[in-house]
């Protein structure tokens, strides 16, 4: 029950009068434990390649990973997420590079796990879009992504990543039923403790543009993803997606994008009491950076946007600002 008062005996501004008082009663704050750091991978050696559409974010070759992971551990970030930039010559209609044990993600997993063991968690994307020549998350037939046939490939992709050392598999493909099938497949092969972070609520969004640039699929996408990703006009459907994935064995769920869907984060958290992650996606990041660079706003907007995820109920945030938290909170 909310206890109310009446002006002038009640003045809510009293608690806002000083900095120490505001800090004393703050309801939400950020620590490094609240973040997952995305890392983009690229083939080659000794490369740190800028991404034009995402200022301040880079693609790295595997030999550069130690410095990044060292810094993440030092800053107290619990988990990193690996995303590959796949060369066009390695892409095909079936996305077979996803099953290559020498692909970028597998080599990165082995390098990080061999050196760092369990000092930091590693999350890997389970989907075919970085590897397909058409840019879709699954097998394409007559402009339609096949569901059950795609899942068969995702099973092998999931198992391969688990074998290489992935801690948290994150299916982002939005195929119906894939969480249950992946869970059973992992259990069958003695990976019962490998966690699944389901992209249960992934909307067909225009906020993904810079990310597709970062992984090399932007100019390849044929058609839209609206026949498998969620309709941004819907919220009840999001709860159905989460409910299904929990029943199928998801340990955590993701809402993506983040800032335009704070209402969804709140609904999911209130209804299911499951760990909820939010993805501050590339479009959100680039919009903030553009506004700051062009003096449309100041850098305080970053902290404000990140706090909003926590206020809505997110347990953690996938953010390109993850390793810059000390610069954001001053």
Where are these regions (language model features)?
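Alpha/beta enzyme core
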Residues: 3-10, 18, 27-36, 42-330
